[in-house]
Amino acid sequence: MKINRHILDNGLRLVHSQDESTQMVALNILYNVGARDEHPEHTGFAHLFEHLMFGGSVNIPDYDMPLQLAGGENNAWTNNDITNYYLTVPRQNVETGFWLESDRMLSLDFSGRSLEVQRGVVMEEFKQRCLNQPYGDVGHLLRPLAYQKHPYQWPTIGKDLSHVANATLEEVKAFFFRFYAPNNAILAVTGNISFEEAVELTEKWFGSVPRREVPVRNLPQEPEQTEERRLTVERNVPLDSLFMAYHMPAHCHPDYYTFDILSDVLSNGPVSYTHLTLPTTSR
């Protein structure tokens, strides 16, 4: 696979790979911001923005409708490190994708109505995932055991429901202009599109988006764990459950993938070592 690269004057990095076997083009834009960049008393903002980014921009009040009319689809996800948005569109309508992504990078439609709508969606998601089902709050219990100083200690959805509930429009604007910048993003384009056309469309639609002052990340260092940490919680749940976590190498470490595979071998699915060796009522 041939990978092509181009950097715009405003700092946006373009990564491209051509695939002529398909009639589709995919655009993936990754912003270098996640839950680790949040203030400890204002968590859940990165995930809230994943939702706000679909609430319309200054020139495009409805993000989904133009994409659907062009035969495209989209989605997004957030974790502690990054926020990722992607769309696919037929090759003949590829410029629609560039138009949509560049306009919401330039400026969202910061309205109180949009904030209230998306705030409600995120709060309902928090309740359904973390409060209204057995074991839903395990991330809120396990993470502070594993990380006592580093901001990995709270899940992406937020440390406390009140943080999103009390978020103001000014705080939301400040978060956007702090992190949603071309010089803090990577645009990946793949599918039935040449490198020359990808560069041309990227320059056309993203070239005028101004570079912004992105803060230097200065995260607290997590001290080495020297002893076991354990928490026992009694809850009215169907079955007892055991959750164990181990520190492992970072993504950029050469041993990361070895540990990732090891975790699957040990505990992922019905053929994992843990599943096959633990006694069950059927044996």
Which stretches of residues belong to each language-model region?
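Buried hydrophobic packing residues in well-ordered domains
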Residues: 11, 29, 47, 85, ...
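An aromatic/glycine/proline-enriched structural segment found at the starts
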Residues: 4, 148-149, 153, 182, ...
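Scaffold signal of the M16-like zinc-metallopeptidase fold and its non-catalytic homologs
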Residues: 52, 56-57, 97, 129-183, ...
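M16/insulysin-pitrilysin zinc metalloprotease superfamily fold
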Residues: 56, 88-121
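M16/MPP (pitrilysin/insulinase) zinc-metallopeptidase core fold and M16-derived inactive scaffolds
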Residues: 26-88, 154-157, 268-276
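Acidic/histidine-enriched alpha-helical segments
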Residues: 69, 109-127, 194, 213-224
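Single conserved hydrophobic/aromatic residue that forms the stacking wall/gate
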Residues: 275, 280-283
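N- or domain-start disorder-to-order transition segments that initiate the globular core
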Residues: 1-22
